[in-house]
């Protein structure tokens, strides 16, 4: 049995992150750790250390799928790990992220008002009106929180769906952060 490290328990962080956002949307900013740290580690380390050791979401999928037997453990369809699908999904994800940043900019510039809504799959509004008390922070900070939490929650649900249908960490095959870090590592290792 391999020795346990502190980072073997980061699946708890994933649960805490989503629970905190459920009660106060401003905790969505903590998700920037999962957004920036993999990129920084890939840029400066030239490896996928984050994906392999620090990704709480991947660990959560392993815990649920393998340990709690919530996965059918069927092989991941080849198209999900194909280069064209991974890059198309990354492009889609970055487009959604860019749209979220643009909406935040519009709120900051006063061109539009704050949209206090969490959306699943960029379409369906989740009725969590209690997650934010208006006026607590500037509107653009809250707008970013709603958008980013929506993005994170949607990706969690996509990961859970493919975890149940296929192998526990099927999400990792086309995770946008994994695709970006892999690209960075390939560039770094060519140097």
Descriptions of predicted regions:
Residues 1-191:
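Non-ligating segments of multi-cofactor redox enzymes
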